[in-house]
Every structure is written in C-alpha cells, then in structure tokens.
C-alpha cells in the first residue's frame, strides 16, 4: 500500500508539481513580506513618536505587540499618553489600550480602536478642566501622508460615550453617537512646526469638515464646515449646523441653574423665531451658522464659548 501511494505521488504531472512549488514559494514570500511590514509598522510608530517629541509633545506608551498574520497588521499599544505644554495652556490625554490595524497591501490606511476610559486634562492660567470619558466604542480611520506621517483624511465613529461629570451642566452625561469626516486640503504639511503650518495656510490649506453628527442628551447636531488658520496660526472656522432638541436643551440648562427662568423664556422665544417653525421627521429644526474668530465660538452673533490656544512648535 505504501509503495502504491509513493508511486501515485511520483506520477503527478509536472505542471501540478510546478503549481505546488509556486504556491509554497508565494506563501513563503508573503510570510517574509508580512514580517518585514510588521517590523516597519513598529519602527514607523517609533519614528512618529520621535518626530512628535521633537515638536514638543510628550509621547509615551507601554508594551507594543504586533499580530494579525496573514490578512492584517495589528499593533496593540498599552497605556498611551500624549501631552503638550505651553505658556497659555497645557493639555494631557491618557487612553486605554489602543489597537491600530492596516491591511498589508494598504498600509497608508489605518484603523484605530480605543474603547474604554480616556482622561483629558486641559490646564490654563485660569483653571484646570478634566474630562473623564468612557467610550463604549471609538473607531478612527486615517489616511496618511507618506512624506510627513500626518493624516490627510479622518473618520471618527463613537457610540455610548459617558462622562463622569457633564461636559455642559444640564445637558446630560451621555453622548449616544458621534461621527466626523474631515479632510486636509492643499499640499500636505511635512510637520506641525509653526513655519510649515504658516506656509500651508498661505498656500490655501484648510481642513474640510465633510460631515459632523452628534447626539448628546436632548440634542442632535449635524452639519459641515471649513477650518483654517488666521494670521496668528489660530483656528478660524465657519460651519452650517442643524440643531434639534434645542427647546429641551434650554429646559435642561435652566434646571441646572446655568440660566435663569426669565432668560430661558427669552431664549425659547428667540429660538422659535429663528427656527421659523421648520420641522422634519425628527422634530423642530434650527439652522444656524457657527463660527470661530479670535479664539471665540459664535452661534450666529451670540458668544457660546472659547477654543484652546494652539501652541505650534517653533521652526520647521
């Protein structure tokens, strides 16, 4: 019986043996290719961290594991930390284990997953503000510029995001869904240095917010817009936003003591007029322009907040 099996193997046509040999060679070659990319992926992460550190950021993370063979390159990074200190403000982010994935044949397109606890601290001369966030799911897709290691396109999808304390008193401690699609236009900047960002701005570079949707507490906000840099390299922006649930939001602000009952009544009257009675299947709809100028956020002509001061690294 053993002799018959060996004879059968010997009698296989040469083309079949050639095909088997090709398959084995391709498999071995792909294995070498994957391992090479895994090393490059890990080295690329280290180079990215080194560049950010040179720009003045603090970058730290725990053990790094690379897995996913054969169809994925998957990096799992423990205890990531990213922070930046400046004269006017400092900020710090600490996140849960971060998983970064890419297809071996499409390494400039990555996906990151970071469900769990995120701790963000922003320190200014006036106050320290902390956001303690727990994300049920948080997925980020990035398309990278090979020359700079900076993203050209970003998509963010988050669900079931809760906060230890409400980001805005009276509007609840849970974001049901969050989505963002943004693209960088113009020649991609090669670094985040002040001189480079100034040149990118002068060449007409912008960040286009293709879509933004947030469902938080009683409100749903969606819209699009453009972000650019002003003469001091601070963000300026113009958005067209649609807001639903604004009446319930005013009630929440009043109940939390953020606004007085009389002011709440006036706000409701103004919002009713601005909405013009417009409604769709989801309820009353308020279309309002939102802008950022001189670090101040405006909703129409009304000041609603401030944006952090951007400290760009000096040099190129």
Residues covered by each model-derived region:
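Small-residue helix/turn framework positions
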Residues: 110-120, 134-275
């Amino acid at each position: 019986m053993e002799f018959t099996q060996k004879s059968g193997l010997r009698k296989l046509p040469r083309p079949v043996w050639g095909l088997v040999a090709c398959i084995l060679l391709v498999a071995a070659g792909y294995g070498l290719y994957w391992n090479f990319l895994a090393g490059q992926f890990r080295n690329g992460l280290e180079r990215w961290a080194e560049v950010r550190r040179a720009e003045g950021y603090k970058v730290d993370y725990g053990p790094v594991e690379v897995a996913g063979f054969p169809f994925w390159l998957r990096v799992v990074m423990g205890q990531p930390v990213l922070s930046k200190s400046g004269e006017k403000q400092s900020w710090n982010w600490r996140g849960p284990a971060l998983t970064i994935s890419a297809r071996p044949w499409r390494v400039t397109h990555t996906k990151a997953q970071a469900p769990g606890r995120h701790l963000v601290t922003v320190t200014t001369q006036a106050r320290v503000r902390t956001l303690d966030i727990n994300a049920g799911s948080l997925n980020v897709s990035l398309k990278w510029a090979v020359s700079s290691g900076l993203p050209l396109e970003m998509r963010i999808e988050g669900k079931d995001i809760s906060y230890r304390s409400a980001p805005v008193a009276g509007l609840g401690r849970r974001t049901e869904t969050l989505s963002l699609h943004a693209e960088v236009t113009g020649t991609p900047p090669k670094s985040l240095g002040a001189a480079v960002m100034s040149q990118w701005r002068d060449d007409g570079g912008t960040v286009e917010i293709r879509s933004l949707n947030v469902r938080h507490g009683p409100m749903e906000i969606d819209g699009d817009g453009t972000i650019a840099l002003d003469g001091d390299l601070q963000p300026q922006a113009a958005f067209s936003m649609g807001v639903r649930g604004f009446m319930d939001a005013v009630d929440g602000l009043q109940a939390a003591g953020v606004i007085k009952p009389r002011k709440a009544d006036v706000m409701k009257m103004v919002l009713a007029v601005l909405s013009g009675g417009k409604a769709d299947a989801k309820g009353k709809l308020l279309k309002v322009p939102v802008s950022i100028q001189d670090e101040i956020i405006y909703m129409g002509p009304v000041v609603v907040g401030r944006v952090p001061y951007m400290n760009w690294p000096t040099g190129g």
